[in-house]
Amino acid sequence: MSYLYDSYFQYIHYNVSMIPTVVKQTSRGDRAYDIFSLLLKERIIFVIGKIENFMANLIVAQIMFLESEDPVKDIHLYINSPGGEVTAGMSIYDIMQFVKPNISTYCIGQAASMGAFLLAAGTTGKRFCLPNSRVMIHQPLGSLHGQATDIAIHATEILKVKENINKLMAKHTGKSIDVIRQDMERDCFLSADESVKYGLVDSVLSKRI
């Protein structure tokens, strides 16, 4: 086992040990549930931290499980993320569009980069920011190295991905593609109210509806 692989699971173990548990009485006696499992029963999913493949697979599995439990009732996605890998984020995005239930999205803390993209991808009319949350949009990041031919191939692919994200952001925000291209050239920060005006979310929530 590699050092990085071992360190990763030490990190997971440490964080799991910090998750609160709740003891509930059942017909078979007391049973301890971690807080996230209890919230999942209420159809609440969290996108917390960097978006990468491991996390994305968990999010996808939870969304599909909740659809199988009830294909009509809304799913609630709470986002507090600095962004992350485009391919991981797109796997979550595609499942959000694929499943039958409406998906409400909520920005708590921050939704940056791919986090902002997923925030905007919720069901229209059901996308929210909490009052002191922040949103940041920008173009996909890429780091290229290797042979010149490979660099050219990857550069072309990055431009394709960038344009695809621009088109999808235009679709979900109602902005023109030209406005999206311009605004996403550099880091663009928005407050909760500014995110509503931009079309990334539909309203600011200070109290649960």
From Swiss-Prot:
GO biological process: protein quality control for misfolded or incompletely synthesized proteins
Protein family: Belongs to the peptidase S14 family.
GO cellular component term of the entry, any: cytoplasm
NCBIfam families from the UniProt entry: clpP, PRK00277.1, PRK12553.1
SUPFAM superfamilies according to UniProt: ClpP/crotonase (SSF52096)
Protein name per the record: ATP-dependent Clp protease proteolytic subunit
Record-level Gene Ontology MF annotations: ATP-dependent peptidase activity; ATPase binding; serine-type endopeptidase activity
Lineage, highest ranks first: Bacteria, Pseudomonadati, Pseudomonadota, Gammaproteobacteria, Enterobacterales
UniProt source species: Blochmanniella floridana
Catalytic activities: Hydrolysis of proteins to small peptides in the presence of ATP and magnesium. alpha-casein is the usual test substrate. In the absence of ATP, only oligopeptides shorter than five residues are hydrolyzed (such as succinyl-Leu-Tyr-|-NHMec, and Leu-Tyr-Leu-|-Tyr-Trp, in which cleavage of the -Tyr-|-Leu- and -Tyr-|-Trp bonds also occurs)
Oligomeric and partner information: Fourteen ClpP subunits assemble into 2 heptameric rings which stack back to back to give a disk-like structure with a central cavity, resembling the structure of eukaryotic proteasomes.
Signal peptide location: none
Active-site residues per Swiss-Prot or TrEMBL entry: S113 (nucleophile), H138
Superkingdom of origin organism: Bacteria
PANTHER family with a match to the protein in the record: ATP-DEPENDENT CLP PROTEASE PROTEOLYTIC SUBUNIT
Biological function: Cleaves peptides in various proteins in a process that requires ATP hydrolysis. Has a chymotrypsin-like activity. Plays a major role in the degradation of misfolded proteins.
EC nos: 3.4.21.92
Keywords: Cytoplasm, Hydrolase, Protease, Serine protease
Subcellular location: Cytoplasm
Chief localisation class: cytoplasm
